[in-house]
Amino acid sequence: MYDFPALREAHDRLWSALARGLEDRSVTPVPRQLTRSLSHRQTWMHPGLLFGQACEYPVAKSFEERLTILATPRYDAPGCTEDFYRSAIVTRADEPAKALEEMRNRRCVVNEPDSNSGMNLFRAALAPLAAGARFFQSVRFSGSHRASLDLVAAGEADVTAVDCVTLAHLQRLEPQLTSRLRVIDWTPASPCLPYVTSRRTSESALTALRAALADVFSDPELAPTRELLFLESVDLSPDTTLGRVRELEVEAHHWRYPVLL
């Protein structure tokens, strides 16, 4: 999910280590390379998906019957705490507003209508302020967090919500963009984007995947790669990701704010 071009080599190193761990545990066949030719949704729907990462909200809404959650990575990017992350609410650096409340009747841009970080968490932050009424002058969809930030920086939108791991990567990789932006507030927290596999993956392969993941996250030779990706550790305990995602949606409905507008 954070596979920026500059980070693909790092992701490939992690996958190579994970693939070796699976082969050592007699899992076959194991792809030699990561698949980058499919969209996120095509990947999540693929019956042969062995290992991937997913946004929690679309999993909860559309893909729960197709995917098994393997584990939750923990990140050390600003805005992350243990298994949880937040979205940064971002505006232009020269925007005079000091609080989210002051963005009322402004132009909002969201990456995707079913994004947890871009919509669901943002809606949770807005719901008590909106209290059932329209909050923004307009809401448009950009297709990606990166595109949303471009629109805000260019003055074509006033505010967006971007997950904190994406923002941390862009602050490293594209300071010429992020220097034109600032964080005005943070959303409520949600579990980090989980690692997933197809529901068709066997129990023995699930066990092997979790064991191989534990090895990848404890391998000292991979420490620089994990650091580059802000990966701190991995939580292999029973998952509560989708429950929290649904709680935030229910809370927004309680505030009579079911749709971000």
Please describe what each predicted stretch is.
Residues 1-66, 71-75, 82-84, 221-261:
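N-terminal hydrophobic or amphipathic helices and topogenic motifs
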Residues 44, 103, 152-153:
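Hydrophobic residues within well-ordered alpha-helices
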Residues 50, 54-64, 128, 153, ...:
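A ligand-binding cleft/hinge motif common to bilobed small-molecule-binding domains
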Residues 54-57, 94, 113, 165, ...:
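Solvent-exposed coil/turn segments that connect beta secondary-structure elements
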Residues 71-73, 79, 83-86, 175-211, ...:
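Periplasmic-binding protein-like
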Residues 210-226:
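Short glycine/proline-rich, acidic loop/turn segments that cap or connect secondary-structure elements
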